[in-house]
Amino acid sequence: MESMKQFKNNNVDLISNNDPLDKNRALIEDLWESVLREECPDDQANRLIQLKELSYSNKVEEYSPKNFKTEIVDIVNSMDLAESISAARAFSLYFQLVNILEQRVEEDRYIQSFTNQNVKKSHDNLDPFAPALARQNAPVTFKELFFRLRRLNVPPGKLEELLQEMDIRLVFTAHPTEIVRHTIRHKQTRVANLLQKIQVEKFLTIEDIKSLKIQLKEEIRLWWRTDELHQFKPSVIDEVDYALHYFQQVLFDAMPQLRGRISSALTENYPDVQMPTESFCTFGSWVGSDRDGNPSVTPEITWRTACYQRQLMLERYIKATSNLRDQLSVSMQWSQVSSSLLESLETDRVKFPEIYEARATRYRSEPYRLKLSYILEKLRLTHERNNLLSEGGWKLSLERESDNKNLELVEKLHYKSVDEFTYDLELIKNSLNSTDLTCEAVNKLLTQVHIFGFSLASLDIRQESTRHSDAIQELTNYLELPKQYDQMSEKDRIQWLNEELNTKRPLIPSEVNWNKSTEETFSVFKMVKRLQEEFGSRICHSYVISMSHSASDLLEVLLLAKEMGLIDQGSQKSTLLVVPLFETVEDLQRAPDVMEQLFQLDFYKSLLPKVGESFKPLQELMLGYSDSNKDSGFLSSNWEIHRAQIALQNLSSRNNILLRLFHGRGGSVGRGGGPAYQAILAQPSGTLKGRIKITEQGEVLASKYSLPELALYNLETVTTAVIQNSLVNNRLDATPEWNDLMTRLAETSRIQYRKLVHENPNLLTFFQEVTPIEEISKLQISSRPARRKKGAKDLSSLRAIPWVFGWTQSRFLLPSWFGVGTALSVELKSDPEQIELLRVLHQRWPFFRMLISKVEMTLSKVDLEVAKYYVDTLGSKENSKSFEEIFDVISKEYNLTKSLVLEITGKNKLLESDRDLRSSVNLRNKTIIPLGFLQVSLLRRLRDQTRQPPISEFIEDRIESKRAYSRSELLRGALLTINGIAAGMRNTG
């Protein structure tokens, strides 16, 4: 057998002597093999290493699973369950180590790009962005961006206007298919840190390097002995803790650095341009507040989430303030202090006599330290009060004496808002500045306070539209209206809801026993009101309505908000922004008409928040990528979203309303995922104007935010793309001819996709049998069910995320490309000359280039040989003919799509223009094959056993037969392969 060394020498397409990735990959390979030999019996370790080397056995360009499938399958099928589990764990570990390594290399490349002071000078005087357009996967840095803007003669005033209005919001979500345990994430971070230390070996002695490698090996061995699977279904609070980890460990310190990099780049290129506000990039979260289809997210959970977020912020501020007190040892003997600061010290002395008694002597001539002591006490009291509120729940009011056992916490001693904390810090900053002193730690803390406040991230409430309709229906039944709500036409509903919104009398009577669903719906609005009273409106000011179909869907939420005191009718102001989420293709097409109806209502327009110097009303709208893709396929979904943005922007402009588009992008291509830089540049010109909101799915958080430089890279990528799109992207608008072509392509693609997915009666059975979808639902990885309705088995009830997850595991990746080939083929058959137009689109239109790039990347991950093995082995005999027909349709569409994508790009191979990505994908494609076969073997045994009459697991574990293993053990093995393949594909759903 070819040795690993020979493999590395022969596979020159994968290995480069000058590539740091390959150098460190060799270290990972050696450590992986060494750990297996120490942790597994010799024969087992040898077989696992043999399996990986078998997958490596052919050169990349000659790669085909056919060449070695039989040998791998024979080894896999000969394994007992213990060996199978070890194999699944081993390959999962391998891929996770490779992922860590690639993240580290990406981080290092970003550092190099930032530290390189020589910005590449474009030789194209007409278009300094031409190099970036030619390599759209390669984002520019702030320094490079501002240099190019200057070359384009973008006026400083225009740039400053955009920076001052810029509003970027990144919203973290809990991902229903987030695979990796929090415990494992911690181990990955430690491994990454050790790899980073090893990479600076030129500064290390031989003994240092040896010690680091020993530590690395020890960490991996501990990892090997840690259970990869969640033992229990995580609670919502567990998911909250997971998401907040990235804020606490990375983002809290990264955000001031981001501002520093903007400042440096502006100083060099636009020295007179004012910096953007500290809050130009802020964060939101759905974790703990997204209740759509998740009964575990109750009002109490959302309240506890808000308290937990404030707790983390207060703890970070207490630590930072304590460090400041150590640092600011300025003495009044050697420096003056502002009168404002001295006055505040006198006020604090009266409020906090105990602190004065304890600290006055020690800090007699050190006013900053004394002031910071008072600040620390206020933060401590705020922290204590927050704990009481968290324990007491959202219905507790500390202002009511009957509820309060700690009255001293509310006697004006704690910080009642973050503004009071900011004011105290500003006093210190201004006093220092008045004597020509600056303190970077004070400036950094102020930046953090401006960005995160006490709330850390805004909690968006999300709920499905019918929940509000059902509540209104029960209400109208109780009130015995002449015409019940469900009997009203949409026109009548709008009229009645608008009348009620303009009526001052209350509509909802108190002391009524509503049904459980209605009571829960009402309680959410009451809890939001209480949240805003305690935390300020910043903590929770957006209410997202999923599956929005009509104007009444928004008016229903506004009516409930009004009834719970979230709308002040006197001033006609609302503290809750109602955000429609248009998800299906039909709803995306209907969205402009829906919003037109709402904009005609004076009361609705008056409730929109007024923003910016223009004080214009702002409407936020969310566009759903997942369900529209599941509904109509990749091409149709993306085009309808693109068209909807243009129509909505035109509508908003006509009504003198600002628009903020909220993109519900997932981690996978089938759910709107892909490189953020490329996706933002592809947005229609004029739709951003410096404002964008994007979901950051749970499954991608680790790849974007686990390391400081990775977080900065992602944040800089998003920000530069928003600036570039807003200022210079209007040169790349589509022509009417391009739009007509895309409309035809989208419609043909949609027909082909729906013909297979929605009209073929055997497709759902095919999906259930030849993918691990049922086993995926048994993973203890999310508080949210995989299906919208309990017990439902139809396609409409299945969420888009597990839909994509299942196809990814079995290597079809169907939602991300199916239908594209047919659409292109039909167009070219009608006019072969159109290939030239398609090539022009690929070169000049960022939107079309983004589409083709995503399809190309996805096609490179498809493995129909492995997919066919799933079909042949897992498909039932009675369905063999229909399954073969379905596979034949998929196979033909794949080959057609691949050939036409290559014809458009002008390349001979997929990903030919991105060597690094092609190398990574090819390596993973080869190495992941044993895991696929292993998964099929375990699924077959598990399903065969499940079909047999039930038998107690106690007996199953001990009898000698073909059912020698319990179902739980077989399921565990299958779930481990799901973990491994997810790591290998760097993708779940």
From Swiss-Prot:
Gene3D superfamilies: Phosphoenolpyruvate/pyruvate domain. InterPro entries: PEP_COase, PEP_COase_bac/pln-type, PEP_COase_Lys_AS, PEPCASE_His_AS, Pyrv/PenolPyrv_kinase-like_dom. It catalyses: oxaloacetate + phosphate = phosphoenolpyruvate + hydrogencarbonate. One of its GO terms (molecular function) is phosphoenolpyruvate carboxylase activity. The keyword Magnesium applies. Signal peptide: none annotated. HAMAP family: PEPcase_type1. Belongs to the PEPCase type 1 family. This is Phosphoenolpyruvate carboxylase. It comes from Prochlorococcus marinus subsp. pastoris (strain CCMP1986 / NIES-2087 / MED4).
